[in-house]
Design a protein with these regions (language model features):
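Metal-dependent phosphodiesterase/phospholipase catalytic core, i.e.
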Residues: 2-147, 151, 155-161, 181-183, ...
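C-terminal active-site rim and adjoining tail of enzyme catalytic domains
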Residues: 160-245
Length: 245
C-alpha cells in the first residue's frame, strides 16, 4: 500500500506491532467475554487435531517475546481466513484505500501430512474454497517452501499466482528445475540475495521478493539491488524509505 515501486508484504500480518488488528478489527470485539487458556508446554497441543472452537480459546497476543521489544500486549485470537479477509475488505472500504492482494502461505513440515497438517492438495483446496467464495482469484498469491503445494496450484489452478519460498543456499536454476515451472515470485531468505540472483530472476521473467527484512539498512540495500518487494514484520518502516529514487 505504500508504493507501487516497492510492494510490502507484512509477515503474518505484522505479527508484533499490529495496531491495525488491535484498533480496527471488529472480530475481536468479544474478547473480554472469553475464557483464556495459557500453555506451559505447547508441544502437548496439536492444532491440526483441534476444531476451531478449541483454537479460538487460545490467547495469542498477551505473551511478550524478547525478539520483539516493540510488541504491544493485547488479547487476541486466531481468526479464520474468511473472517480475516472480511475484516480487511471492510477496513479498506471504510477508509477508501486500494484493495490489497493476499499472500497466503501453506506452512508444511516434512513428514507431517495427516499428523500435524493436511496434505498439500487438501491444504490448497481449503484455501482456494475461501478464495473463490470471496472472489479473490485475481488478488491472491499462494506461497510455500513446500514445492508440492505450488505444483498442485500450477496444475489445478494455473491462473493463480505462486511464490516459491527459499531458505537454503541452493542455486536458482536447480530450485526452478525441482519446482518444474516458473513461479510468479521467487522468495528467498534476504541474506541470500545479491545482484546476480536479482538479475537471474528478472531475466527469467520472475519477480523476486525476499523475506523477512526488518531493518531500514537491509531494505535500502535490497531496494538498490532492484528487488520487486519485501516481506517484513514491520511494514511501518516503509514510511522511512525513499522509494522514488
Amino acid at each position: 500500500p505504500n508504493s507501487k515501486l516497492m510492494p510490502t508484504i507484512p509477515e503474518k500480518f505484522s505479527r508484533v506491532e499490529n495496531k491495525f488488528l488491535k484498533k480496527s478489527y471488529s472480530v475481536y470485539d468479544d474478547l473480554p467475554k472469553m475464557k483464556w487458556t495459557f500453555l506451559k508446554d505447547e508441544k502437548k497441543y496439536n492444532i491440526f487435531k483441534m476444531n476451531y472452537s478449541e483454537v479460538k480459546k487460545f490467547d495469542v497476543g498477551s505473551k511478550l517475546h524478547k525478539r520483539f521489544p516493540g510488541q504491544q500486549k493485547f488479547k487476541a485470537y486466531k481468526p479464520l481466513l474468511a473472517e480475516l479477509i472480511d475484516s480487511v475488505e471492510n477496513y479498506v472500504k471504510i477508509h477508501r484505500l486500494p484493495k490489497p492482494d493476499y499472500n497466503i502461505e501453506t506452512k508444511l513440515i516434512r513428514k507431517g501430512d495427516g499428523e500435524f497438517q493436511p496434505s498439500p492438495e487438501e491444504f490448497v483446496e481449503i484455501i482456494m474454497a475461501i478464495v473463490k467464495q470471496k472472489k479473490l482469484e485475481k488478488r491472491v498469491i499462494i506461497q510455500s517452501f513446500d514445492i508440492r503445494s505450488l505444483q498442485y496450484v500450477n496444475k489445478k489452478y494455473p491462473k493463480i499466482r505462486t511464490s516459491l519460498g527459499i531458505d537454503e543456499k541452493e542455486d536458482f536454476e536447480n530450485n526452478i528445475k525441482d519446482l518444474g515451472f516458473k513461479p510468479t515470485i521467487y522468495s528467498p531468505y534476504y541474506v541470500l540475495v545479491g545482484k546476480t540472483l536479482v538479475d537471474k530472476c528478472h531475466a527469467a521473467g520472475i519477480k523476486i521478493i525476499p523475506w523477512t527484512v526488518n531493518s531500514i539498512k537491509d531494505i535500502e540495500y535490497l531496494k538498490n539491488l532492484g528487488v520487486d518487494g519485501i516481506i517484513t514484520d514491520y511494514p511501518n518502516l516503509m514510511g522511512q524509505i525513499d522509494l522514488k529514487n
